């Protein structure tokens, strides 16, 4: 037991490795298996993973707001938003109609039993992770209404 | 020793987290290490007006440290939990002290995924097996054992597992075996024009039979299985799932485990929908009969302790294999979360209250529509409308209470299609509209019907009908500053009658935000039939205020206020919390 503890201590102090997404597969809205790492690995492209749920009002606000300016962002920067729904079996059936009903243009993935959320130690949605060239380059817990402009400036600077 | 070590690791790692975040250097290593820390603390205070005394340990916290190390295909991980000095009020008593809560080792390649130790899992919609975690609700039903997942080719996924279900820092006694196959037939047969999936699950629970039972009329092994198919073409989709739970003695809260009352259970789920850009229509129907599937034969009992009454694991949604959430809209409005429906999956035959139920039947219907920019109803920025309706009823069933000699011997026969008395309904419409570049609003109308007597099984006839109006405006200033004002009112015809609520939140930038809110209850009769009449028998302000700081992956918040006693719900499951007043402090970070 003591050895394990020491090992953990060593690990937690020594490792300062670059942070990456875990190698996990999630289902897309049309039920295709998508690898969150290898299916989003275009060189120099900025991938924005937004963790959200149908019951999370600030999440929907954030994704609505980005959706309004999404074509402009994509024109100016080689970027893509991946909206990862953490809805479980209670609200999961509402994801597809909601995404279409709000005219969202995003690639939507389903983290039904929250394996990805847990693996990244995300406490609550909304939570945003920006990945470029395989490395997590920015993270933001929560969302402030109206911060889209600042967020895009940040994306361009990465 | 083990506990001290765990506490030490928790503290040291917390320091390391801070240190690590200072260091922005990126080194290319194959070895990856990451994790997260979450801490929820409360300082319970005396509230003279509410006649609430602080508990014996007023300062309490739930702390979680998650650590994971990865090298190529191998990952090892652990979660240390600390409940100091005790867990927050009304958490599962199984959460006590500081210890390793989870540990696991995993190998994952493209076709093989093997885990030893603790793991989470869900088969199908989870109605027979879901092992999951929700810290806010104090749920962690991970299995401890082993699991193999095999994906031989695109479109085929096969899982086999064995484990015992976690409860606090222990596991339950019963063995759980499971197997699951998911097939994407359209992919397998290289069809692009439509989608077709099928899945099968099998679960076997092996729980010892108490020695006192003479000639048991049931097996110690309970099998359960489910099958599901899904089809989609263009914007249309349809899916169905059937679950069957083998015969086992029924546990009822009032009469306990009845070794002579042996029944199987089943559940049918049907989902149909159509969606295209700008429109989504969805209908979900479900019928459940005797679908409570526990990891032991009966709930684990926690003896009364001080002013805490005796409770059992079921009160904390613990030692439960099945996940049968309420299929209703999870509202963002505060007041719409006072009368919350909880799915009725259990059998209850009670001659004293004459409340007899065997499950539920009903459905939920959704329409989402986007009025385009420039259309008459869309205006300059478009208008989004969401309509949601749900209705849930008891099953139509014939009941028996006695055998031919007049002794208590319950039995039932539930009709396949047919609803009994109504448990709950919710009719609501939500409109979101952007009015100008800087101003947007949300409006909601909600009508609810809540049959407390039937849902909770109490003596008192108490149906509550409510109407709720909710309006929220968000104004953004330059530079990420914004002000949110939310006002709502609930008119209720029964119980505590009317409520009003106001929320004001100011976001200074991406990092800082503050809020104040108040919920005010008025208009009720103190002598009336109140659902929970033990506390707050006066017109009361439930005020709360807080400040939050967020930076990158970290979030800190400090709050002060009054917590209403009742159900706190998240992800479809509710937790009862006692009324309290105090300070709260939360930290969460990942690294």
Regions found by a protein language model. Give the residues of each.
Chain B
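Beta-strand-dominated lipid-handling architectures at cellular/organellar boundaries
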Residues: 20, 36-39, 230
């Amino acid at each position: 037991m003591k050895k394990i503890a020491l090992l953990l201590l060593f690990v937690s102090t020594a490792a300062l490795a670059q942070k990456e997404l875990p190698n996990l597969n999630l289902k897309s809205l049309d039920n295709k298996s998508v690898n969150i790492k290898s299916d989003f690995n275009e060189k120099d492209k900025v991938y924005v993973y937004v963790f959200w749920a149908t019951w999370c009002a600030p999440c929907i606000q954030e994704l609505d707001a980005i959706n309004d300016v999404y074509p402009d962002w994509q024109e100016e920067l080689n970027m893509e938003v991946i909206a990862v729904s953490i809805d479980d079996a209670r609200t999961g059936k509402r994801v597809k109609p909601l995404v279409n009903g709000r005219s969202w243009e995003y690639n939507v993935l389903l983290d039904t039993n929250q394996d990805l959320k847990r693996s990244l130690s995300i406490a609550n949605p909304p939570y945003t992770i920006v990945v470029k060239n395989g490395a997590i380059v920015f993270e933001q817990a929560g969302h402030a209404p109206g911060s889209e402009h600042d967020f895009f400036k940040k994306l361009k600077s990465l | 020793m083990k506990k001290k070590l765990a506490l030490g690791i928790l503290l040291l790692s917390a320091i390391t987290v801070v240190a690590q975040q200072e260091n922005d250097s990126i080194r290319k290593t194959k070895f990856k290490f990451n994790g997260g820390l979450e801490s929820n603390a409360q300082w319970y205070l005396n509230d003279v007006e509410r006649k609430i005394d602080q508990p014996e340990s007023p300062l309490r916290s739930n702390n979680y440290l998650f650590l994971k190390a990865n090298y190529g295909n191998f990952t090892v991980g652990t979660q240390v939990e600390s409940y100091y000095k005790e867990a927050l009020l009304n958490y599962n008593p199984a959460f006590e002290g500081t210890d390793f809560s989870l540990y696991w080792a995993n190998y994952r390649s493209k076709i093989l995924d093997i885990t030893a130790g603790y793991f989470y899992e869900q088969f199908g919609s989870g109605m027979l097996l879901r092992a999951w975690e929700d810290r806010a609700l104090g749920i962690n039903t991970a299995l401890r054992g082993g699991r193999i997942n095999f994906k031989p080719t695109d479109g085929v996924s096969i899982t086999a597992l064995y484990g015992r279900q976690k409860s606090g820092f222990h596991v339950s006694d019963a063995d759980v075996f499971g197997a699951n196959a998911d097939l994407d037939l359209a992919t397998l047969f290289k069809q692009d024009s439509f989608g077709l999936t099928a899945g099968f699950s099998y679960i076997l629970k092996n729980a010892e039979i108490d020695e006192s039972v003479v000639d048991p009329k049931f097996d110690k092994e309970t099998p359960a299985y489910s099958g599901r198919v899904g089809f989609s073409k263009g914007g249309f989709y349809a899916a169905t799932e059937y679950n069957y739970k083998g015969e086992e003695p029924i546990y009822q809260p009032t009469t306990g485990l009845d070794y002579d009352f042996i029944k199987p259970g089943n559940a049918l789920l049907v989902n149909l929908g159509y969606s295209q850009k700008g429109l989504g229509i969805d209908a979900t129907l479900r019928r459940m009969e005797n679908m409570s599937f526990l990891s032991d034969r009966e709930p684990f009992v926690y003896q009364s302790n001080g002013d805490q009454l005796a409770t059992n694991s079921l009160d904390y949604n613990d030692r439960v294999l099945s996940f049968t959430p309420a299929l209703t809209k999870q509202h963002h409005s505060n007041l719409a979360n006072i009368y919350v429906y909880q799915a009725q999956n259990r059998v209850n035959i009670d001659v004293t209250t004459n409340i007899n139920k065997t499950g539920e039947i009903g459905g939920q219907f959704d329409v989402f529509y986007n009025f385009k920019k420039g259309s008459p109803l869309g205006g300059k920025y478009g208008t989004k409308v969401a309509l949601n309706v749900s209705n849930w009823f008891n099953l139509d069933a014939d009941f028996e209470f006695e055998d031919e000699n007049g002794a208590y011997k319950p039995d039932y026969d539930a009709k396949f299609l047919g609803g009994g008395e109504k448990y709950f309904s919710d009719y609501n419409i939500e409109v979101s509209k952007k009015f100008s570049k800087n101003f947007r609003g949300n409006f909601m109308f909600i009508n609810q019907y809540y049959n407390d007597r039937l849902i909770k099984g109490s003596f008192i006839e108490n149906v509550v009908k409510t109407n709720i109006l909710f309006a929220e405006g968000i104004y953004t200033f330059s530079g990420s500053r914004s002000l949110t004002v939310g006002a709502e009112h609930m008119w209720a015809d029964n119980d505590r009658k009317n409520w009003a609520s106001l929320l004001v939140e100011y976001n200074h930038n991406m990092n800082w935000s503050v809020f104040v809110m108040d919920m005010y209850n008025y208009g009720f009769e103190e002598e009336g039939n109140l659902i929970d009449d033990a506390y707050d028998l006066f017109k009361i302000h439930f005020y709360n205020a807080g400040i939050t700081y967020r930076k990158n992956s970290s979030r800190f918040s400090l709050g002060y206020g009054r917590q209403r006693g009742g159900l706190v719900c998240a992800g479809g499951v509710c937790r009862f919390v006692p009324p309290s007043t105090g300070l709260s402090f939360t930290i969460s970070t990942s690294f």
